[in-house]
Amino acid sequence: MSYLILSIVILLIGILGIILNRSNLIIMLMCVELVLLASTILLLFESRVLYTLFGQIFAIVILTVAAAESAIGLAIMVNYYRLRGTIAVRASNLLRG
């Protein structure tokens, strides 16, 4: 039961971090990683309770996707910093329609 509480707490911290922090892209990326970690812990808890391997398999897939997502996100942020000189969210007005 403690895994469920831990997962919910980490999920809430990640969501609140995304909502409350609108100034730094790196902190927002870290909060997205917290949400993915919480979902992984929840799947592992489900796998342990139901005695199945599906939760563990999905957890490995989620961790793989999270690693790729963070690598791509950091590469985009490095290029954005080289272009703009800042990683502040407020300075991002590159998308014009």
Curated annotation (Swiss-Prot):
It is a multi-pass membrane protein. It comes from the Eukaryota. It holds the Pfam family Oxidored_q2. It comes from Sarcophyton glaucum (Toadstool umbrella leather coral). GO terms for molecular function: NADH dehydrogenase (ubiquinone) activity. Gene3D superfamilies: 1.10.287.3510. The keyword Transmembrane helix applies. It is an enzyme of class 7 (translocase). Coiled coil: none annotated. Its main location: mitochondrion. Core subunit of the mitochondrial membrane respiratory chain NADH dehydrogenase (Complex I) that is believed to belong to the minimal assembly required for catalysis. Complex I functions in the transfer of electrons from NADH to the respiratory chain. The immediate electron acceptor for the enzyme is believed to be ubiquinone. Keywords: Electron transport, Membrane, Mitochondrion, NAD, Respiratory chain, Translocase, Transmembrane, Transmembrane helix, Transport, Ubiquinone. It is found in: Mitochondrion membrane. The gene is ND4L. The chain crosses the membrane at residues 1-21, 25-45, 57-77. One of its GO terms (cellular component) is mitochondrial membrane. GO terms for biological process: ATP synthesis coupled electron transport. Its EC number is 7.1.1.2. Belongs to the complex I subunit 4L family. This is NADH-ubiquinone oxidoreductase chain 4L. It catalyses: a ubiquinone + NADH + 5 H(+)(in) = a ubiquinol + NAD(+) + 4 H(+)(out).
